[in-house]
Amino acid sequence: MSALEHYMYVLECGDGSLYTGYAVDVEARLAAHRAGRGAKYTRSHAPVRLAAQARFFSRARAMSAEALFKRLPRDRKDALLAQAMGEPFEEVLRRELPGFGCDTAEEFVCRSLACSIDVGYRDFMARLMPTVDPSRVVGVRTPVLRAIARELAWRPDAPSYLRALPHRLFEEMQVHAFAIGLERDYDAALALYDRFLPHVDNWATCDQLPVKVLAKGPGRTLQKVGEWLASGYCYTVRFGIGVLMRLYLDERFERRFLDEVAAARLPGAPERPDPESHAYYVDMMRAWYFAEALARQEAAALPYLLARGEGALLDEWTRRKAIQKAIESRRIAPELKARLRQAR
């Protein structure tokens, strides 16, 4: 049983009666019933055995199935349970219960994720994102998440998924991010970014949020970047810096962008941010920006990495991190790397 799954289950009690319930972990719930910690009904009608369980991908769907099943006459319940001996109970219910309906957009996403879980990849990703509770990571690779987002975008109920924030799982947030990247209308995309960014809680979702559509309105996007940099929220600030790095280091570059990124620190940020703090994730992006700017706009960016002491243009921690990233880059000439090493 995974974090994506919700269950409706049916117990047969000692006197032959049936008890129907909802659970995210049927085995644990069954153990509770058998130990007398379940419902009053099962305590007074023990022992119990599991007659069937139906897997769904939203709590609402599982509880709806429970309610619909409870209202059936006993002979109808027995007929459905008999069918469940030869096929998944959820398929029986989906086919036989009136008004059951099709998957919602949320259920489509969760069902799709459940088909592609990689436990090893889950553990790998959880280690890379210390700000995310590991229980919120199920382990689905990025190409699969992009494919799910493309399918989601074609669904008529996709807007309902894009309104349902925040999503519980990291991968649900990733699908949402990639779906935003498929929006071609500039104004619609801006609204989606503004709705989504306050709920981003890790560097991976922030950095993989597509920005291509923002190039359609470079002037308005710059105004929006100014709002994001001034937001005071870690991943909104980080995203704003990322937009400047990805869209404004070519012919759109202006020297003032360097000053804006240099000033884009969180309120009260320490001189040496803790690796698990919000300040760390903003300052690391600032360092990345200056290393990238050095590769693409060397004359303008170099003074920020060389200046120290009273004439410094960057805080010392970010300056050193930017130098480190630049030295590691294959796009920086050896002669310049040597100069940077002397400036550390």
Specify the residue positions occupied by each region the protein language model found.
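GIY-YIG nuclease catalytic motif and its immediate N-terminal context
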Residues: M1-F56, A60-K77, L81-F100
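Alpha-helical scaffold domains
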Residues: L97-R344
